[in-house]
């Protein structure tokens, strides 16, 4: 049995599930590693709606699949500050708005003592319940009928049908999800 008490413990456990290439984006994105776990929420993306719902529900640790701060590296690297563009021009209004939104989100997270853990690479590669399998199940594909595969994707055999019928079926199967329904609470 795992003794997971802090955000750091949880992050370590998540990263032990499947070996991924380094460097990885799977890490604590925001908040203190020593934060004791009260309640855990999971989501596809930590939007402000999801964060507000988490605070309302008493969640203090959020595991998200996609970036919290809108760039793949989540507050790391040249893309955040647009340093590549600063060589030729000043910040645009769009860039300034983007940076303001990031600061507002960080203030909300800090004010509410939230910890954000990104679990992207592990979940993309986890073979028994990772993103590929979870999406296939939600789309009602036969997860035992894989015709091609690697560690990032699977190709499933399906019955021949028109593109419109397949699209309608997939849309119906995905319709139940919204930012409110995609949160799982412990």
Model-found features: residue ranges?
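Hydrophobic structural segments
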Residues: 1-186
């Amino acid at each position: 049995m795992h003794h997971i008490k802090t955000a750091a413990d949880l992050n370590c456990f998540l990263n032990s599930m499947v070996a991924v290439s380094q460097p990885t984006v799977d890490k604590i994105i925001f908040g203190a590693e020593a934060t004791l776990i009260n309640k855990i929420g999971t989501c596809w993306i930590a939007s402000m709606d999801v964060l507000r719902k988490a605070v309302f529900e008493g969640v203090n640790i959020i595991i998200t699949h996609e970036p919290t701060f809108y760039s793949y590296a989540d507050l790391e690297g040249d893309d955040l500050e647009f340093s590549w563009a600063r060589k030729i021009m000043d910040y645009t209004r769009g860039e300034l708005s983007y940076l303001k939104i990031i600061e507002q989100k960080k203030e909300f997270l800090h004010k509410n003592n939230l910890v954000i853990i990104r679990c992207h690479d592990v979940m993309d590669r986890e073979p028994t319940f990772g993103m590929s399998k979870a999406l296939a199940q939600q789309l009602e594909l036969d997860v035992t009928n894989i015709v091609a595969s690697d560690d990032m994707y699977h190709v499933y055999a399906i019955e021949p049908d028109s593109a419109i019928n397949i699209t309608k079926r997939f849309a119906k199967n995905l319709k139940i999800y919204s930012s409110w329904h995609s949160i799982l609470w412990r």
